Amino acid sequence: MQTINGNTDISPLMLASEYGQVTIVKYLLKHGNYNVKGWEKDNLHSDVSCQLTQITEISTLCEKANNPNHQYILETI
């Protein structure tokens, strides 16, 4: 199970427009190994109302999911 800052309920693909992360969310949904609720496929333990504020944490999760474009995500923003 993935954790962010010790919290296992935060989804890396939550609604992020307030934090300017719309581009990252769209990118991960299109190219990442994530389903619509935000966790790696077949690992649904998230509350999509939780908010993630660190773009670098999304990149780290992408890297752990073996997404070769995790650095590109940061460079694109």
Swiss-Prot record:
One Pfam family cited in the UniProt record for this chain: Ank
Gene3D superfamilies: Ankyrin repeat-containing domain (1.25.40.20)
Keyword flag Iron: no
KW Transmembrane (keyword) present: no
SUPFAM superfamilies: Ankyrin repeat
Protein origin, superkingdom: Bacteria
InterPro entries according to UniProt: Ankyrin_rpt, Ankyrin_rpt-contain_sf
Protein name: Putative ankyrin repeat protein RC0956
Annotated organism of origin: Rickettsia conorii (strain ATCC VR-613 / Malish 7)
